Amino acid sequence: MIIKKFLQKKIIRFINSQKVLKFFFYYHKFFNNKGLKDIGFDFSTKKNRKFIVQDIIDTNKYNSYLEIGCFDDELFDFIKINNKIGVDPVTGGTVRLTSDQFFSKNNEYFDCIFIDGLHTYNQVKKDIQNSLKFLNNNGVILLHDCLPNNFYEQATPRCQFTWNGDVWKAIVECRTNKDLDVYTCY
């Protein structure tokens, strides 16, 4: 009975997330008030982050990729690109350092940077600032875990298995920077 309720809840959440995606896609398409450029990706049709990241890389013909926080290499192994570096202090990727340690030694620039490291506002803010220093012209920085489903998923310190942390605060702050185009999707 518990498993059935759990599965029903997940299915309803998945169906609703598809509706939300379509709504936000069309809302931003028709009522976009910042005059932001189109990044060439229809968020309403491809939900999985692996396909989103790969499609952005392919569409823009990017050649270099940096992933901060690789954990089990699910995304890192999926991405097909000539030059890719994965940074994680514990497991996954190609470099065993914290993101701060990596950026202090790095001299390489990237077209696409995916941030999924330590899920705290302060660290993500530093990761964004450091990434901007090593981002090629017309490059993109992508962030994961920006939309917690409830209070506990965003609480710091971490108090449950599923955890987004307070990454969302970094997105809010980035939106105040007039030099950055910030896009969000569910």
Q: What residue ranges belong to the model's regions?
A:
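A short alpha-helical cap/connector motif
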Residues: 1-114, 118-186
